[in-house]
């Protein structure tokens, strides 16, 4: 933007008032503001304005502002009316983001609203739990940190190419905290694995021929010789045998992922855990 345009740039002060976190109001206002790339917007958020006294403090702070748009999500009618009255008296624009929706639903259903502060925020908690589960899955992928096994809702074990990582992420999307461990020949199994409730451990296996083809294709994709120890049938059989011995020792639930989609395997895991659909 040129200096001349900067000097002539219009400025709007966006005042966001909410009796909860204020994310709903902020997102809606921002969605409108981005339609005006040449306008400078100054955002001021006032969350948790839950009574008239707090609201009056906001009014005192913004009373001298110019070019103001007040956007509010206030459940109680007296605070709504106070915000509207203040805006009109000070020649400020305003938008009530909740009342219209609530009134129309009441008109259609005859039901009375419960006037619960922060109801949208509570509803969104499931979303934040899911994000937390996704972060957990990434943090404890491939056995990066053994302590994750003790904190997880599910622990996936399996040799290479048994869908551990995609399964972890799929289950995380169901709000499950998942850690996984690749079973590599001649490597130490972390002590934490033996401390996990066997019901939480899922042993993944595969058909040798399927695993052979998957690994060969993986090597080809990397531009490498497909005939290596990694894809050798004898090596694959030895890996699977070692994995099955570990599963038997742990007493864990075993799933053969051959010819199964991620969704199908995840459904079996959730059924085993007694979960219908964790992400509700």
Swiss-Prot record:
Q: Name one Pfam family in it.
A: Kinase-PPPase
Name the catalysed reactions.
N(tele)-phospho-L-histidyl/L-threonyl-[pyruvate, phosphate dikinase] + ADP = N(tele)-phospho-L-histidyl/O-phospho-L-threonyl-[pyruvate, phosphate dikinase] + AMP + H(+); N(tele)-phospho-L-histidyl/O-phospho-L-threonyl-[pyruvate, phosphate dikinase] + phosphate + H(+) = N(tele)-phospho-L-histidyl/L-threonyl-[pyruvate, phosphate dikinase] + diphosphate
Q: What class of enzyme is it?
A: transferase
InterPro entries recorded:
Kinase-pyrophosphorylase, P-loop_NTPase, PPDK_reg
Q: Which residues form the signal peptide?
A: none
Q: State if Magnesium is listed as a keyword.
A: no
* Coiled-coil features, chain-numbered ranges: none
What is an example of a GO molecular function annotated in this UniProt entry? ATP binding
Q: What is its EC number?
A: 2.7.11.32, 2.7.4.27
Q: Which residues bind ADP?
A: 158-165
Can the keyword Nucleotide-binding be found in this entry's annotation?
Answer: yes
UniProt keyword terms in alphabetical order = Kinase, Nucleotide-binding, Serine/threonine-protein kinase, Transferase
Domain of life, per lineage: Bacteria
Q: Mind telling me which NCBIfam families this protein's record contains?
A: PRK05339.1 (NF003742)
Q: Record's PANTHER family? A: PYRUVATE, PHOSPHATE DIKINASE REGULATORY PROTEIN 1, CHLOROPLASTIC
Protein family (similarity comment):
Belongs to the pyruvate, phosphate/water dikinase regulatory protein family. PDRP subfamily.
Record's function text: Bifunctional serine/threonine kinase and phosphorylase involved in the regulation of the pyruvate, phosphate dikinase (PPDK) by catalyzing its phosphorylation/dephosphorylation.
Protein name in UniProt:
Putative pyruvate, phosphate dikinase regulatory protein
What is the organism of origin for this protein? Lactobacillus gasseri (strain ATCC 33323 / DSM 20243 / BCRC 14619 / CIP 102991 / JCM 1131 / KCTC 3163 / NCIMB 11718 / NCTC 13722 / AM63)
- Give the source lineage, highest ranks first: Bacteria, Bacillati, Bacillota, Bacilli, Lactobacillales
